Amino acid sequence: RLKEHVGCQDQVIAAYGGFNRVDFWGEGQFRTSPIMITWERLNELQDHLMLFFTGLSRTASDIAAEQVSVSPQKARELRVMHQMVDEAINILKSPHGLGDFGKLLDEGWQLKRSLTGRISTPYIDELYERARRGGCTGGKLIGAGGGGFLLLFAPPEAQAGVAAALDGLLQVPFRFES
């Protein structure tokens, strides 16, 4: 048993692999369900994603502990965030464009930021706003918050503008695997 407050999402995702929905409940209880979309749709999603290292590191357990402590007061926000999972999956499975996925990411990021003041920092907020002005429509920090990697959603034709807006940050190439 870990003696730190850390989420187990990363561990479950790494252990199971694939493109899955993971639902958590109770102490260490979870269920994984594959998200069934075509390889073409997954590539379309991939083509809209950009990953940047913020240059900041943080202690995830401190941020996670604060999130746990405020969870009862933030039940509405957490419920909305949970409902957004179904909406995201519906967007991915629909035959329409992915534009709404970026908007949903932005909405989710704003909700997550409202959970605790330690999710973001003025520097992260500035980076996110620069990316938005550059053409991204949504994004989020990967992990507990406070630093690490910024995942952004931008149409392929806007990605040069996003990269220019975040000049000086390391863009990390990545690909989904089959």
Predicted regions and their residues:
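C-terminal nucleotide
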Residues: L2-H5, Q9-K140, L151-S178
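Glycine-rich active-site/cofactor-binding loop and its immediate structural neighborhood
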Residues: G147
